Each structure stands twice: as C-alpha cells, then as structure tokens.
C-alpha cells in the first residue's frame, strides 16, 4: 500500500514540486531571517566578547547598554581594586571618533582604549604586527574590516597613517575583532593615548573590567563591588545579554523580522495546505478503489501521512540547503561577518515544517476518511 501511495505522489509531478517548493520557501525564509536576526543582536555585545580575560564589568549605575556611557571618575578604579574578591581591575575606554580615510572622506569609527600596562581589552587574535608596538606614541591597532574600509583597494599592511579627530595615528597591528552593531571600523590604542584622541573632559573612563579571585563566582564578586562602591557591576555574560536585550526592546528589528517570519509560516500553511488538499481531491477515486477492496481507514491515514512526510522531508531539506548556502556565500563578504545559521534555528524550522505538513494532512484527511467507495462505479 505504501508503494501505491508513493506512485500516487510522484505521478503528478507538478503538484509534488509545488508542495516541495511551498515547504522549502517557508523553511528558507525562516532560517534566513532568524539567522540574520541572531547575527544582528549578537553584535550588540561584541565589545564584551573582545575582552575574554575579564569576567566582570563595572560601570555607572545609569548605564543601560554599551553605546550610552556615563564616564567614571579615575578614583573609582582604586575603589574597585580594593574590593575583596577582585584579582585585578583595569580601565577601558570606548568612544566614537571621526577618521579621515585614504581618499579624504570622513568615516565614523569606534575607538577602544586598553590598559597601558597589560593591554587587556585588545582582541586576542592578532593578524599582523606586534602588540608591544602599541606602546609607541600615536600607535593604534585596527580591525581587519576597518583597514579594508579606510584604505580601500590597498593590501593589508602596517605603517599606514590616519587622522583620528584630526590627530595622527600610525597603524602598528591588524586584529580580528567581533563585528560591531554600530560601526565596522574599530581602532584600539592604549588608554592614555585614547584620552589624547578624544579629550572629552576630566572623567573619561568608560568601564572598569575586572577578574574575580579564587573560587568566587563573577556574580558574587559583582554583587560585592556594587555593595561596596555603589557602582553597577555585572558578569560578562549578564552585561552582554543586557546589551542584546536593549536592542531587542528599543529597536524595530524584532518586529520587522518577526513579521517576515510569520508571513513565511502563513504562506507555507496556505500554499501547502491548498495544494495537498487538491492533490488528495484529484486522487480521491484511487482512495475509493482502495477502500472498496477492503483497505482500512487506518491504512489510508498512514498512506496520506506518508505522502505528507515525504513532501515535508524533501521540502525541508531543499529549504535548509538553500539557507545554508546563503550564509556560506554571504559570509564571505567582510560586511556580513558574524552572521550564521544556528543549529537551534534549523531545528526549530524543522518543527515548523513538520507542523505545516501535519496541518495540511489533517485538512485533507476528512475527504479520504469519508469517501464513498461507490464513486468508483459512477460516470
């Protein structure tokens, strides 16, 4: 009986292809949009990811995200270092600056000031150069994508000179940093050098990054810092998630992408449900013949679900392959770094595809169960 079900399914190739494309389109749209969404919001906490040595971030109590910063007083660093449970604490500077590109154009960029002594705050992956050269006057490191955008068409090299806020900056290292949400150009320099580039006032320390001592958890040390200093202290994962939550709650990105995903699901249900119903309707006489020769309703239900399962499996595979190829191809572009297809998104889209197929099968099932075997002998 199941071989008969397959022959019925593959006999009408046009409807089979239409059913497969309906599931594939829905799967592709869900995976592509959710993959982009996760890649976008992940960029919100990129600065935290680039400081893997620290597991605690300390900031002004009013800070809500990584982009709206209220500077701390220099004396706060000593207070944090004196809190029991803190192994070390160093300053971190973050600010937006204007850079003049190689062709004379102005670009907005991100400037990160790392600790002068330890250089904590610099991304761990150095593509070119020596990080010790950052201790030279006017020395900066630049992200790989930032170099390509500032010096378009030039091979990656050291020694290039840029103007940050009309001050001289010499590239001594190329680093691989995490893609940022607001800027694709990121410069790194010593904390003291960063203050010279910006000169934003007396208090310029954006954050204090710290490491917990002993066997104490970052959450426990953070609570201790907050209790003793009055500053806001959070573990690195918590602060990164807070930055992501800010983007989710204060931008239109979730609504925009969520609408597209919902439309993809609704279109999938409508197209697959309608076409599968038409497929069953056109094969109603075949089901009537099977019923006339004694095939049970349970066996007929199994045949319909087998047909639906084959359509769902093929359609989901095609859609998932298309989404994977999209991210593989688009990921080669420097501006699309950090976007990927998480396994849980693929698994979730599989569940959605299965739900679409089950709904389509249930919608068509009534015709099969109540078909009159006598129609075989009519007209």
What are these regions (language model features)?
Residues 1-30, 41, 305:
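N-terminal Sec/SRP start-transfer signal
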Residues 16-20, 321, 343-351:
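Hydrophobic alpha-helical transmembrane segments
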Residues 36, 44, 221-270, 277-284, ...:
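Peri-transmembrane interface segments
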Residues 74-83, 87-136, 165, 188-191:
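The feature marks short, hydrophobic/small-residue-biased sequence motifs that occur predominantly
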Residues 121-124, 130, 142-237:
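Basic-flanked hydrophobic alpha-helices used for secretion and membrane insertion
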Residues 264, 276, 286-331, 348, ...:
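Transmembrane alpha-helical interface segments in multi-pass membrane proteins
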Residues 342-379:
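C-terminal membrane-exit region of the final transmembrane helix in multipass inner-membrane proteins
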């Amino acid at each position: 009986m199941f071989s008969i079900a397959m022959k019925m399914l593959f006999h009408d190739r046009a409807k089979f292809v239409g059913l497969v494309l309906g599931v594939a389109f829905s799967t592709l749209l869900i995976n592509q949009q959710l993959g982009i969404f996760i890649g976008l919001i992940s960029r919100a906490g990129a600065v935290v990811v680039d400081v893997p040595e620290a597991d605690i971030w300390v900031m002004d109590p009013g800070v809500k995200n990584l982009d709206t910063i209220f500077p701390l007083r220099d004396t706060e660093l000593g207070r944090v270092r004196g809190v029991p449970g803190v192994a070390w604490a160093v300053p971190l500077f973050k600010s937006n600056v204007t850079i003049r590109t190689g062709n004379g154009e102005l670009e907005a960029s991100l400037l990160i000031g790392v600790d002068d002594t330890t250089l904590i705050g610099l991304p761990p992956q150095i593509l070119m150069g020596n990080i010790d050269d950052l201790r030279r006057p006017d020395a900066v490191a630049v992200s790989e994508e930032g170099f390509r955008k500032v010096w378009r068409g030039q091979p990656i090299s050291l020694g290039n000179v840029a103007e940050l806020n009309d001050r001289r900056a010499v590239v001594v290292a190329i680093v691989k940093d995490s893609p940022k949400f607001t800027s694709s150009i990121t410069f790194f320099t010593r904390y003291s050098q960063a203050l010279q580039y910006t000169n934003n006032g007396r208090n310029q320390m954006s954050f204090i990054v710290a490491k917990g001592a002993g066997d104490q958890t970052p959450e426990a040390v953070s609570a201790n810092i907050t209790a003793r200093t009055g500053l806001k202290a959070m573990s690195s994962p918590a602060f990164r998630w807070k930055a992501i939550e800010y983007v989710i709650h204060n931008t239109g990105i979730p609504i925009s992408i969520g609408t597209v995903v919902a439309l993809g699901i609704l279109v999938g249900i409508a197209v697959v449900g309608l076409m599968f119903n038409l497929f069953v309707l056109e094969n109603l006489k075949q089901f009537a013949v099977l019923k006339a020769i004694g095939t049970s309703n349970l066996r007929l239900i199994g045949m319909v679900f087998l047909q639906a399962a084959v359509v769902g499996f093929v359609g989901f595979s095609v859609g998932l392959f298309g989404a994977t190829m999209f991210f593989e191809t688009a990921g080669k572009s420097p501006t699309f770094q950090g976007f990927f297809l998480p396994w849980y998104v693929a698994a979730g889209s599989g569940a959605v595809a299965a739900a679409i197929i089950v709904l389509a099968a249930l919608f068509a099932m009534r015709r099969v169960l109540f078909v009159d075997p006598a129609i075989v002998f009519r007209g």
